[in-house]
Regions:
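N-terminal alpha/beta PP-like core and its mobile active-site loop of ThDP/TPP-dependent enzymes
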Residues: 2-151
């Protein structure tokens, strides 16, 4: 077996593209598309992978993070939960805008894949750009807001 070297984002998109479902006897992609607003935390990794896999997993430019996620929920409802849309945003306020939609998806049991922008993993985020400032927990970030509304 030959070793394949991929970035995490490329491996993720290859995996998502490989997922299929059957609708009316036809094999179709489980993830038919993705909405994206690029910024710090997702442009260098997910942006490049989405561009390279555009023919297999179409990407659509969003204008507001909450509307992207709510559109994905509407798509899942229209498809009777048989297909799942993806929404990705930068970290910071963009990620926070998707929290309400995550709650809507959870309470209505509708599938939605949210990929909020990544935050620093190996150092404290200084100088402060768009991070959550909590002096009692300096490692807390925006993505922690998704914990109560995700599974």
């Amino acid at each position: 077996m030959k070793t394949v070297r991929l970035s995490c984002a490329h491996a993720l998109f290859k995996f998502l593209i490989a997922q299929k479902t059957i609708i009316d006897g036809k094999k179709v992609p489980l993830f038919p598309g993705a909405f994206a607003i690029y910024g710090h935390g997702n442009v260098a990794c997910l942006g490049q992978a989405m561009e390279e896999f555009q023919s297999d997993l179409p990407g659509y430019r969003g204008h507001h993070e909450q509307s992207m996620a709510l559109s994905g929920i509407g798509y899942a409802r229209a498809m009777r939960r048989k297909q799942i849309f993806i929404a990705t945003s930068s970290s910071g306020p963009g990620a926070m805008n998707m929290v309400t939609a995550a709650g809507v998806a959870l309470s209505n049991r509708l599938p939605l894949l949210l990929l909020p922008g990544d935050v620093f993993a190996s150092r404290f985020p200084d100088p402060v750009l768009q991070q959550v400032e909590n002096f009692n927990s300096p490692v807390e970030n925006q993505n922690d807001a998704f914990k109560p509304v995700s599974r």
